[in-house]
Amino acid sequence: MKSLALNYVLQTARVCISGSRPPLHLLVMNNSIQTIPFTNLILAFIPAIVVVVIVWRWGIGYKRSIYALARMLIQLLLIGYFLVFIFKSDSSLIVIGVLAVMLFTASWIALHTKKIPRRELYLKSFCSILLGGGIILLLITQGVLNLSPWYLPSYVIPLAGIIFANAMNSVSLAVERLEAETERSVPYEQARIIALRASLIPITNTLLAVGIVSLPGMMTGQILSGVSPFIAARYQIMVMCMIFGSAGISAACFLAMVRSNFTTKEENI
């Protein structure tokens, strides 16, 4: 069973590097790879249940934790079935539609500020994530991986999710810190620098800790699937670079676009 998983992953890696069109069995899920039975998956909920009990005993509000766990379970099961449909469809239009939904949603979620209505900043949030995330996604899928077809769902959608999510978080941190600094009457140019630095703190810490404190999710998943750690490390390097790039570019673009929203006319002049 392990050899089947290794063969599947290595075949996928080879066709991506060579640029040739993968066979149909690589475009869809490989049913030969061992799955986790639901009865075994229940064991993974034991630590979560322990936390819920602790929260309940401490009177913090256990209902929210239960709701979060239930929602997580439903969302992941639904997205699993949805992705199976997308992978089997092999349609560029469906992939583009999914990317559009991800982009529009990320642009809206990124804006948590309460002082300025989201609608005033939404277009700028959208453009910044599109520029920062879209360019990185294009570079990775067509430059690094050289996917064929270019819309290969099993690669494009997961990579887009990673890129857009990190760009979204970076923009969210940037706007929150920018708002806090401008409320303290800090000049915009200085506030922008502080906001950009704050938006890059999480990913910078991750870069410093990767490989020493923790093994990232993608690398861990590949190693568990039987992939050589050297191959997994290359993929993880690619992922870390695209995360850092999308986060920094998106935040910088957003901070450059929203100057008029956080300054007076006199300051702009």
Residue ranges and their predicted role:
Residues 30-147:
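N-terminal transmembrane hairpin
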Residues 58-59, 180-189, 224-230:
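Juxtamembrane helix-boundary/capping and inter-helix hinge elements in multi-pass membrane proteins
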Residues 138-187:
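Membrane-proximal helix-loop-helix units in multi-pass membrane proteins
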Residues 157-161, 231-252:
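Pore-lining and gate-forming transmembrane alpha-helices of multi-pass membrane transport proteins
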Residues 166-180, 189-221, 250, 254:
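Alpha-helical transmembrane segments of helical membrane proteins, especially in multi-pass transport
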Residues 242-269:
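Hydrophobic alpha-helical transmembrane segments of membrane transport and translocation systems
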